């Protein structure tokens, strides 16, 4: 029963960086994993790529041959993957014992409106018994701008409904939050997505948005009515935050409650089942803004102690 992450999000949200960071983390805890690049327009891949869609699809050639723009070419490419999904199935069968991370294109409509990505993943579920979790990244910078945050909420909600699978939303680049100045609300407000009516006065301060006051209010009410969207907070370079989000993903997809034979990381799975997060109960505001340096040091000391304990046990 293979498990996978389907990593989506708008351009600049840090998808490829996250994929590489997650791959490194999984390797560190002993879980066999691979990254699959599904973005034919991704020209700067820094991670080891087990399956690369660019080997069979050239987005520049698609633009030239079919007189399409960049967005149209990506839609065409995704439809081509869907139509020729047997190629992807064949490649994935070579890695049946690996946990898979899919790095998807950043074109928003591919995971909010278009059906090809969803159909591809559904085919993997049916043919290879995959257990996917959609991981949607949003740049934490949106928390500095209420209108950008409302837009991110709507994209996340639409993505969750469109992809129709277990879903984890992430505010990425959390380590930069302390450099943005004072946020309009505490970070906890943005992660919990509760009482969005408090955003209305902030949105109305911008004269350009006052004419859209009713629309913004309706969007906030819509998000609250569904009560589906919330965010985890991640800094890829911070191992502890990546471990926390992996714990959430494993719980969402069922990895933490199933067999450990595929991943080979029984120690990690048992830890997830038992809990044990040393910073459990610490608010995102406190961790990433109010006392960031203090908790950075604390987590570093914990990691050093853990490394020393492992060395002693091996000795």
Swiss-Prot record:
Signal sequence region: none
Annotated GO CC locations: cytoplasm; cytosol; nucleus
Pfam family, one: ATP_bind_1
Residues at which GTP binds: 12-17, 172-175
The protein's Enzyme Commission number: 3.6.5.-
GO molecular function term, any single one: GTPase activity
Biological processes, Gene Ontology terms: protein import into nucleus
Intervals of motif Gly-Pro-Asn (GPN)-loop: 69-71
SUPFAM superfamilies registered for this protein in UniProt: P-loop containing nucleoside triphosphate hydrolases
Compartments (UniProt record): Cytoplasm; Nucleus
Site (described: Stabilizes the phosphate intermediate): 71
Keywords linked to the UniProt accession: Cytoplasm, GTP-binding, Hydrolase, Nucleotide-binding, Nucleus
Main location: cytoplasm
Enzyme type, top EC level: hydrolase
Described purpose of this protein according to its UniProt entry: Small GTPase required for proper nuclear import of RNA polymerase II and III (RNAPII and RNAPIII). May act at an RNAP assembly step prior to nuclear import.
Annotated family: Belongs to the GPN-loop GTPase family.
Subunit organization: Heterodimers with gpn1 or fet5/gpn3. Binds to RNA polymerase II (RNAPII).
Full protein name: GPN-loop GTPase 2
Species, as recorded: Schizosaccharomyces pombe (strain 972 / ATCC 24843)
Gene for this chain: gpn2
């Amino acid at each position: 029963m293979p498990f996978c992450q389907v990593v989506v999000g708008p351009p600049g949200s840090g998808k490829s960086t996250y994929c590489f960071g997650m791959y490194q983390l999984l390797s560190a805890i002993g879980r066999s994993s691979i990254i699959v690049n599904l973005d034919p327009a991704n020209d700067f891949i820094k991670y080891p790529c087990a399956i690369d869609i660019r080997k069979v699809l050239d987005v520049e050639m698609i633009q030239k041959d079919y007189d399409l723009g960049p967005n149209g070419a990506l839609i065409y490419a995704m439809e081509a993957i869907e139509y020729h999904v047997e190629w992807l199935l064949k490649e994935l069968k070579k890695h049946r014992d690996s946990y898979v991370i899919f790095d998807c294109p950043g074109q928003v409509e591919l995971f909010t409106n278009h059906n090809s990505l969803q159909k591809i993943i559904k085919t993997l579920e049916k043919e290879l018994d995959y257990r996917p979790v959609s991981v949607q990244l949003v740049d934490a910078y949106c928390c500095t701008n209420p209108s950008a945050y409302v837009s991110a909420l709507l994209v996340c909600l639409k993505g969750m409904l469109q992809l129709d699978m277990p879903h984890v939303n992430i505010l990425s680049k959390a380590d930069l939050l302390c450099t943005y100045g004072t946020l309009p609300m505490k970070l906890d407000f943005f992660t919990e997505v509760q009482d969005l009516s408090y955003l209305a006065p902030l949105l109305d301060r911008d004269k350009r948005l006052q004419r859209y006051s009713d629309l913004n209010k309706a969007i906030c009410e819509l998000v609250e009515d569904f009560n589906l969207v919330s965010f985890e907070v991640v800094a890829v370079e911070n191992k502890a935050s990546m471990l926390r989000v992996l714990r959430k993903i494993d719980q969402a997809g069922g990895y933490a409650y199933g067999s450990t034979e595929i991943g080979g990381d029984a120690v990690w799975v048992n830890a997830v089942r038992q809990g044990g997060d040393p910073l459990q109960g610490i608010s995102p505001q406190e961790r990433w803004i109010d006392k960031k340096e203090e908790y950075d040091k604390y987590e570093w000391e914990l990691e050093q102690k853990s490394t020393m304990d492992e060395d002693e046990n091996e000795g």
